[in-house]
Amino acid sequence: MAKTLYEKVFDAHVVYENENELPILYIDRHLIHEVTSPQAFSGLKMAKRRMARADLTLATIDHDVSTKSVDLNACSDMAKEQITTLMQNTKEFGVRLLGLGDKNQGIVHIVSPELGFTLPGVTLVCGDSHTATHGAFGALAFGIGTSEVEHVMATQTLKQAKLKTMKIECKGQFQKGVYAKDLILYLIAQYGTAKGTGYAIEFCGELIRNLSMEARMTLCNMAIEFGAKVGMIAPDEITFEYIKGKEFAPKGEEFQKYCEYWKSLRSDEGAKYDESITLDVSKIKPQISYGTNPSQVIGIDEKIPKISDFKNQSEQKSLLDALSYVNLEQDQVIEGVKIDIVFIGSCTNGRLEDLKIAADILKGRKIHKNVKALIVPGSMQVRKEAENLGLDKIFIEAGCEWRYAGCSMCLGMNDDKANSGQRVASTSNRNFVGRQGKGSITHLMSPASAAACAIEGVICDNRKYLGV
């Protein structure tokens, strides 16, 4: 029977199934961080249990760490407590920790691929909703709750219902100034934040085959904002080249054997999907969010919708509530809206490729006098590579702040926050009410668009800086 990529990986990991019961999956990789792990470790201690496979667990510090310094004392009291607790727990249970000062420390969904801990065909979980990021490698990756974190620690297994499957085929090529971030924002805008609920998504097609691993990770990262639990892309030569030589990756002849197996991790001809979507990506323009959920997105040259554009009362109310919060109007042009802060970073767009894109626009230019711009590499490895290329100098000379690795302004859990009423051009993944600080206003966009906004001090079209 022909199978989809998702079905192949899921079925290969079922260790127990019985009628009227959820299947039990073996978990190959477990990622943990300082926020969702303390209760899980406490549960193990109370039950006097050890971890089943500490060697298959990788810990990092990312969510509430300071990005101004690698000194623990630069963190808030809450952050210090969570970080210290993780340090103690990982030492006690024998888990590898990428702690403060570690050359590989960074955002969990960036450091794992960098180290080759994320591999095609594995099951991978983390107490974080954006775990779908790792599906870019053909891994079955999804976020779990704290009680499930403890269960994986204790048993290396998890009960999991089989999801429906959705194919999203992307045809054509991007216009100049359009990126993977624009594609996923466009997709969510067209179909809503609930379209993917109950599905494992597979991105495929001409465009996907030509994307870098960084761009693929951006796509899969925001599958969760589409409503899906899982986003996947079949591994190929681009995937293998990215993995080759990394710390946890197979080496030598073993690597070649794995590559042969990984080549089988693609949907069979004739495999049935529960739903399919086909997109012509050549029509997509730079996308900007205007409201308070990731479906409230328009092209840079479009106007904010009017209430009459929606027939559903709940959608009408959602629009009015959002516009009231963000202080914008129906039928207003989004271009030209004043920006206070620019944030380039996060597990969505904090990789080297993202920083290169931003630097290309900022090179030789200055940011607007009324704008504060934070450039936050997603890992210390990204930071080092960026500095080797001189990107830090470009950012600093432009007037940006060059920070250390962490989740930073993606969420209001650390010291990098916007004040009430401040408007942020952000490369992160969520624009919820107060997401970047109480009363803050978030506009989601690509690194190129964010860099252009930093220069002009208003929401603008990045393509004018790319010769378009």
Swiss-Prot record:
Pfam families per UniProt: Aconitase
PANTHER family the UniProt entry points to: 3-ISOPROPYLMALATE DEHYDRATASE, HOMOACONITASE, MITOCHONDRIAL-RELATED
UniProt record, GO biological process: L-leucine biosynthetic process
Catalysis: reaction(s): (2R,3S)-3-isopropylmalate = (2S)-2-isopropylmalate
Organism of origin: Campylobacter jejuni subsp. doylei (strain ATCC BAA-1458 / RM4099 / 269.97)
Entry's cofactor comment: Binds 1 [4Fe-4S] cluster per subunit.
Upper taxonomic lineage: Bacteria, Pseudomonadati, Campylobacterota, Epsilonproteobacteria, Campylobacterales
Binding site for [4Fe-4S] cluster: 347, 407, 410
Function: Catalyzes the isomerization between 2-isopropylmalate and 3-isopropylmalate, via the formation of 2-isopropylmaleate.
Name assigned to this protein: 3-isopropylmalate dehydratase large subunit
Alphabetic keyword roster: 4Fe-4S, Amino-acid biosynthesis, Branched-chain amino acid biosynthesis, Iron, Iron-sulfur, Leucine biosynthesis, Lyase, Metal-binding
Quaternary structure (record): Heterodimer of LeuC and LeuD.
Documented EC number(s): 4.2.1.33
Cofactors: [4Fe-4S] cluster
Pathway recorded for this protein: Amino-acid biosynthesis; L-leucine biosynthesis; L-leucine from 3-methyl-2-oxobutanoate: step 2/4
A GO term for molecular function: 4 iron, 4 sulfur cluster binding
